[in-house]
């Protein structure tokens, strides 16, 4: 059997298993090798180097050095010329006929064989993307490992969609150990790589864990600050006081990971596309510009900032800037001054550092999670103090609507539903509605419109408007169900309202994934009166399940829900109702239009359902748009001071 070294780039990841793998496993190995070959031919990743020279090369920065340096490999005498070995596919010994096969074709083809079949796959045809790249996602959370909101859904699905299109993708996130999450990282192994990061008054050692899943390299940064009870960012007493320190470590580690981690036998190298998500990862573009490019490193790399929620910016006192380990001249990139009304006292100058602002200044491209939100962040109302800066970068600002995972959210296969249905056969939806009414203890009435709400119980989601509108709605012949938790005052209101309207209202305090699926499938209408919504996922889930959304026309809700117009051409009559401005009167008007259509115009209602179910909100669609952003980023020179 040929050694990994003899096989060349990527061969180390093709190790023969003890049991013959299934077709899916073989194709996964082939895809990974395809990316390896494309990286070698296209120059998007460097050929693996010995670890010792990686540290000693003068062009690399010296502020981060691996704490252990393996010995350099010894030189062995050159062997006698022999034909190139056939790469081991991991499925046993094969002896294909190589007659007439040229050296060029050997570089371009991969053999996959089993006892029954032998296939030849062309490397260039394996990738769906026109240009494949090495993509590094940096995030504070990613499903299924750790998740607190929509950010985790995006960073758990978009990397997989890009990998399936032929890109080599790494996700870098913390390795949270709080007891409940420990099992999620059980399949990640210790890479034996660790570095010391100079920041916050000392050198802090972090280690790397790795799991290869769904064609993506999931890299977990390990440090004691990620090992504590509570949620990802805080506990019952509020946000952790050292969050700035925790995510500074993450950003430094993410910059080093492509240079030192030999994943599948070779590093990602310097020509990477960094996709940094929200403030937790926003120091990455600053580090690339301030601490790497001056040393000649990452000059071919680019960065894209993805803003999921501009309300969270990572603002800390200005006195913490020296702790970040950045040169003094870079303070202006992160400088933030609070308006006078937000200062604590008359002597407060309002000076602070803002992680997200640093990324807005230094990132090569900026993406928001919907087209509407990309406009809103440039306005005084939606810009959260960064509107002028974001307006100055309009030329590199774009919006891309998030996708949904159709493996988890598909009414024809959903494991949480009692009955399945599809756009071609909607009979199962009525059965799901009856089962939901039975589960909630509501009267089983197929003729009564069932309205649902799923989300946090707070001011941003418009719960106060629902609370004021419920007495008026309960006079109508409808049923209403709410699922969520949050403000204790709203939780108490839900309980008391349920006791007052036993046959019409149900409030489920808390959150349950199975129940959320059954509410999405069983309801006729989903209400989302959010004050602002960068993207929103529940309206996408609702349309996928044939549930008609009634939403406030803001951000991603306005982008994804098309207003019903019965006089439009066939196929363009809309998918729901988007009302504006956000008032009780407008919300009630939109709901009553939906209720009237449900009762009196069954054919129009069925058209609304089917158009929503036929909409393309897959992650593959979103991934193709991100590829265009990557192309634009590489057209321009990177940020330098």
From Swiss-Prot:
* The organism's place on the tree of life at top rank: Eukaryota
What name appears for this protein in its UniProt entry? Soluble starch synthase 1, chloroplastic/amyloplastic
Regions of biased composition (Pro residues) lie at 68-87
Q: Which residues bind ADP-alpha-D-glucose?
A: 147
Gene disruption: observed consequences: Decrease in average length of amylopectin chains. Reduced content of amylopectin chains with a degree of polymerization (DP) of 8 to 12, but increased content of chains with a DP of 6 to 7 and a DP of 16 to 19.
Listed PANTHER family? ALPHA AMYLASE DOMAIN-CONTAINING PROTEIN (PTHR45825:SF11), GRANULE-BOUND STARCH SYNTHASE 1, CHLOROPLASTIC/AMYLOPLASTIC (PTHR45825)
Q: Where is the transit peptide?
A: 1-113
Q: Which UniProt keywords apply?
A: Amyloplast, Chloroplast, Glycosyltransferase, Plastid, Starch biosynthesis, Transferase, Transit peptide
Query: To which species is this protein native?
Result: Oryza sativa subsp. japonica
Region of interest (Disordered), ranges: 62-96
Which Pfam families did the record assign? Glyco_transf_5, Glycos_transf_1
Q: What else is known?
A: Three forms of soluble starch synthase were purified: RSS1, RSS2 and RSS3.
From the UniProt record, give the pathway where this protein acts: Glycan biosynthesis; starch biosynthesis
A molecular function annotated in GO for this UniProt entry is: alpha-1,4-glucan glucosyltransferase (UDP-glucose donor) activity
Q: Where in the cell is it found?
A: Plastid, Chloroplast; Plastid, Amyloplast
Query: Where does the entry say this protein is expressed, by tissue?
Result: Leaves and immature seeds.
What job does the chain carry out? Involved in starch synthesis in endosperm amyloplasts. Plays a role in the elongation of amylopectin chains. Synthesizes preferentially amylopectin chains with a degree of polymerization (DP) of 7 to 11 by elongating chains with a DP of 4 to 7. Generates distincly chains with a DP of 8 to 12 chains from short chains with a DP of 6 to 7.
This protein's record includes keyword Transferase: yes
Write out the GO cellular component annotations: amyloplast; chloroplast
**Which reaction does this chain catalyze?**
[(1->4)-alpha-D-glucosyl](n) + ADP-alpha-D-glucose = [(1->4)-alpha-D-glucosyl](n+1) + ADP + H(+)
Major localization listed first in the record, in broad terms: plastid
- Give an example GO biological process: amylopectin biosynthetic process
Q: What is its EC number?
A: 2.4.1.21
Q: Which family does it belong to?
A: Belongs to the glycosyltransferase 1 family. Bacterial/plant glycogen synthase subfamily.
Q: Which Gene3D superfamilies match?
A: Glycogen Phosphorylase B (3.40.50.2000)
């Amino acid at each position: 059997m040929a050694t990994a070294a003899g096989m060349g780039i990527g061969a180390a990841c093709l190790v023969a298993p003890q049991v013959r793998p299934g077709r899916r496993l073989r194709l996964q190995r082939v895809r990974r090798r395809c990316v390896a070959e494309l990286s070698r031919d296209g120059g998007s990743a460097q050929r693996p180097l010995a670890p010792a020279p990686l540290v000693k090369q003068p062009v690399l920065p010296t502020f981060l050095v691996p704490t252990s340096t393996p010995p350099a490999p010894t030189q062995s005498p050159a062997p006698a010329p022999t034909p190139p070995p056939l790469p081991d596919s991991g499925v046993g010994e094969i002896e294909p006929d190589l007659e007439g096969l040229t050296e060029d074709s050997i570089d371009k083809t991969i053999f996959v064989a089993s006892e029954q079949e032998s296939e030849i796959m062309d490397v260039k045809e394996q990738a769906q993307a026109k240009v494949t790249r090495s993509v590094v996602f940096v995030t504070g959370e990613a499903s299924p490992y750790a998740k607190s909101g929509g950010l985790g859904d995006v960073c758990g699905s978009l990397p997989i969609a890009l990998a399936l299109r032929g890109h080599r993708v790494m996700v870098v996130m913390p390795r949270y150990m709080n007891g409940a999450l420990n099992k999620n990282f059980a399949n990640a192994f210790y890479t034996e790589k660790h570095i010391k990061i100079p920041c916050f008054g000392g050198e802090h050692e972090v280690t790397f864990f790795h799991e290869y899943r769904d064609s993506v390299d999931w890299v977990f940064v390990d440090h004691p600050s990620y090992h504590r009870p509570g949620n990802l960012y805080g506990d019952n007493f509020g946000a952790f006081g050292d969050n700035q320190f925790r995510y500074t470590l993450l950003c430094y580690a993410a910059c080093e990971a492509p240079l030192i981690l030999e994943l599948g036998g070779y590093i990602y190298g310097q020509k990477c596309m960094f996709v940094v998500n929200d403030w937790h990862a926003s120091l990455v573009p600053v580090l690339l510009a301030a601490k790497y490019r001056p040393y000649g490193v990452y000059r071919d790399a680019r960065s894209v900032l993805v803003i999921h929620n501009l309300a969270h910016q990572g603002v800390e006192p200005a006195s913490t800037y020296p702790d970040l380990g950045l040169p003094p001249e870079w303070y202006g990139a992160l400088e933030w001054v609070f308006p006078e009304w937000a200062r604590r006292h008359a002597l407060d100058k309002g000076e602070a550092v803002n992680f997200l602002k640093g990324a807005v200044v230094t990132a090569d491209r900026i993406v928001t999670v919907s087209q509407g939100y990309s406009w809103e962040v440039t306005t005084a109302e939606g810009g959260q103090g960064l509107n002028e800066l974001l307006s100055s970068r309009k030329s590199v600002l774009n919006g891309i609507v998030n996708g949904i995972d159709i493996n988890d959210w598909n009414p024809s296969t959903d494991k949480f539903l009692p009955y399945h249905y599809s756009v071609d056969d909607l009979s199962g939806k009525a059965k799901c509605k009856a089962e939901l009414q039975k589960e909630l203890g509501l009267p089983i009435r197929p003729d009564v419109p069932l309205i649902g709400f799923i989300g946090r119980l707070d001011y941003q989601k418009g719960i106060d408007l629902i609370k004021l509108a419920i007495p008026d709605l309960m006079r109508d012949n409808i049923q209403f169900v709410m699922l969520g938790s949050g403000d204790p005052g709203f939780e108490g209101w839900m309980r008391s309202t349920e006791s007052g309207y036993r046959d019409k209202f149900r409030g489920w305090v808390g959150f349950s994934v199975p129940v959320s699926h059954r509410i999405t499938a069983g309801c006729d209408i989903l209400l989302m009166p959010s004050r602002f919504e960068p993207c929103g996922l529940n309206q996408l889930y609702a349309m996928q399940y044939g549930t008609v959304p009634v939403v406030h026309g803001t951000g991603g809700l306005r982008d994804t829900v098309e207003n019903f117009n019965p006089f439009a051409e066939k196929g363009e009559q809309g998918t729901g109702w988007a009302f504006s401005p956000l008032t009780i009167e407008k919300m009630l008007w939109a709901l009553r239009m939906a209720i009237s259509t449900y009762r009196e115009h069954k054919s129009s209602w069925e058209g609304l359902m089917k158009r929503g179910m036929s909409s393309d909100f897959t992650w593959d669609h979103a991934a193709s748009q991100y590829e265009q952003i990557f192309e634009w980023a590489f057209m321009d020179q990177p940020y330098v001071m």
